[in-house]
């Protein structure tokens, strides 16, 4: 049974058939490049111009208050900037999870991505948005691919394409999001969650 303040999509992610806005890219166990190792990327845009996403599980030590103090109140814990990727690290991008039943249409500064996820214009007034969103996450930089580049990496098995839950974006500071996403998948994919973090332990 779903509580009044919850939405069915909070618990059951729809099956991901292909890359699109609102899907996750999960780094495969063989992807050892430090920037993306065990990363979980939320796809914000995927179109003829390429693909843009943000890494959900790379918190920085920089407090949101020190960079964008007006957004600190709405920022989800741990209220730090997250490293969205290697592209334009001096630029900020913001995602928010809408409250159940909230409609982003007509709310200045919100652009719908998928489900209850929206992009937020950081020039908007946080006080105006507060009633519509559960929380925001602000990313320094993003991850980007040109046309065909991501498809090649997926064919090479660098990435696993999966569906997202709203809670993935606002995940807590100590959570192993990579493992959490895998554990909710059917067998045999869920077994990858047992893959050791430190390969030297294996």
From Swiss-Prot:
Gene3D superfamilies named in the record: VC0467-like
Origin superkingdom: Bacteria
Disulfide bonds: none
Cellular component GO terms held in the UniProt record: cytosol; plasma membrane
InterPro entries assigned to the protein according to its UniProt record, in alphabetical order: AlgH-like (IPR003774)
One Pfam family it belongs to: DUF179
Family: Belongs to the UPF0301 (AlgH) family.
NCBIfam families: PRK00228.2-1 (NF001269), PRK00228.2-4 (NF001272)
Protein name in the entry: UPF0301 protein Rv0038
């Amino acid at each position: 049974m779903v509580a009044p303040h919850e939405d069915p999509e909070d618990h059951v992610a729809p099956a991901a058939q292909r890359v699109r806005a609102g899907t996750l890219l999960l780094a495969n166990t063989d992807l050892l490049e430090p920037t993306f190792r065990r990363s979980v990327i939320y796809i914000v845009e995927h179109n003829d111009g390429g693909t843009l996403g943000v890494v959900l599980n790379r918190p920085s030590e920089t407090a949101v208050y020190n960079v964008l103090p007006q957004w600190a109140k709405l920022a989800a814990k741990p209220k730090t900037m997250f490293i969205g990727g290697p592209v334009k690290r001096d630029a900020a991008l913001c995602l928010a999870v809408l409250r159940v039943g909230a409609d982003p249409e007509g709310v200045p500064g919100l652009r719908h991505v998928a489900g209850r996820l929206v992009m937020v214009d950081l020039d908007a007034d946080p006080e105006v948005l507060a009633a519509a969103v559960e929380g925001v996450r602000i990313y320094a930089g993003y991850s980007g691919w040109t046309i065909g580049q991501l498809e090649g990496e997926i064919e090479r098995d660098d990435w696993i394409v999966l569906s997202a839950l709203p809670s993935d974006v606002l995940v807590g500071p100590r959570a192993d999001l990579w493992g959490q996403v895998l554990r909710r998948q059917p067998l045999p994919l869920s077994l990858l969650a047992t893959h050791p973090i430190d390969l030297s332990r294996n």
